[in-house]
Amino acid sequence: AVFGEPGGKFEWVMTGRHLTIRADGNSVENTAFGGPIFYGHAVEANEKPDHPGNVWWPQARLANEIFQSLDGKQREKALLEGTPPDSDETVRLRGNASGIQGLPGSALTRDQRDLLKKTLKSMLSMYRESDVEEAVGCLDAHGGYEELRLSFYKEGDLGSDGIWDRWRVEG
């Protein structure tokens, strides 16, 4: 769907059960893409632990590198019970990180924060460079990587291998 007028303030949104991607013409002030992005991919009805053919699995592997680098106290904050609900609330902007569960970026070491940057760079790699620059600019204007929250969810750990299949970066 296209909202607004291309050439002016506009937003293009494609959404479905496991997908919300966006491109915008600065339709919402201080908000990259006009709102949150969300994606998942299930190649098969019953995914295998290594997710063969899943286009987003390389990003999950990067996120799991962050988890593996965490110490015990950090893991306690980052690893949450359950899983996020499948609802409209899942993909709404929620403002600053207060009230968002997970490990704050401010609790990461420099090396861990570099892994977070690498993960986010991969997550944004399919977007235009101008959109990526806007996203990073918005992030910097709101406190940077230190203000993000990183969450991994116990439910849905395929293979019970401690490689977290469901995770989020928010803030």
Where are these regions (language model features)?
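Acidic/His-rich structured neighborhood in mature extracellular/periplasmic domains
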Residues: A1-G102
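Long, His/Glu/Asp-enriched segments that create or flank divalent metal/ion-associated functional microenvironments
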Residues: P6, W12-M14, H18-I21, L148-G171
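Arginine residue identity/basic-tract feature
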Residues: R17, R22, R61, R75, ...
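Acidic-enriched, low-complexity/disordered segments with a strong bias for Aspartate over Glutamate
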Residues: D24, D50, D71, D86-D88, ...
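Generic serine detector
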Residues: S27, S69, S87, S98, ...
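Extended intrinsically disordered, low-complexity coil regions enriched in Ser, Thr, Gly, Ala
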Residues: G34-P36, A78-L80, A107-E147
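Accessory structured domains or lobes within enzymes
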Residues: T90-N96, Y127, D131-D165
